[in-house]
Amino acid sequence: MVREASIVAVVGWKNSGKTGLVERLVGESVRRGLRVSTAKHAHHAVDIDQPGRDSWRHREAGAHEVALVSASRFVLQRELRGRAEPSLLEVAATLESVDLLIAEGFKSSPVAKIEAWRDACDRPPLASKDDTVFALAVEGGSSTLSRHHPRLAERLPVFELGDAEGILTAVVNHLKP
């Protein structure tokens, strides 16, 4: 089970750099000796199985959960079958304990958030209406954000989108009890 105090979500509009930022944060976390997990929210149906495979057949037969296990990987698929999509906190409760859970997406979750933002997204930062965003990772850094959203640039820490070291330090400091 992952404690809520060790969860950060990377949020932002489509093509804002979220996935690349998560990759860099995971790499920097591992470099620092942290044990890290990730959770990714998908806006489309997810199926990692292949039609006709044994695990697919188990699921099609009605299994609630299907565990696929090998010497190098363990995958658990849970069928919702009409139940509500689990929240990030519900997902975190099912994961092994780690130093940090980095989520991609989950904009409506009540956890601490870093926003990835590019002015090419042509949308205002989510941070302008979301108090759980505690910092921004911006392509072009604070000068870019200051040109477009000066109040936000004054109110929140702003990092260059590629500055995984600085962003992770901010995350760790923000999540400290």
Give residue ranges: language-model regions.
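Phosphate-binding/switch loop-helix module in NTP-utilizing enzymes
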Residues: 79-108
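N-terminal phosphate/diphosphate-binding loop that engages ATP/GTP or pyrophosphate donors
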Residues: 24-89
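Fold-independent oxyanion-binding glycine-rich loops
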Residues: 13, 41-42, 51, 70-71, ...
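Short loop/turn elements that form and flank the Walker-type P-loop nucleotide-binding site
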Residues: 3-4, 62, 95-97, 129-130
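Walker A (P-loop) phosphate-binding motif
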Residues: 1-44, 148
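P-loop NTP-binding site
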Residues: 3-5, 25-29, 91-95, 159, ...
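Conserved active-site and cofactor/substrate-binding residues in soluble primary-metabolism enzymes
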Residues: 5, 16-20, 24, 53, ...
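Phosphate/Mg2+-binding loops and adjacent switch elements
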Residues: 100-176
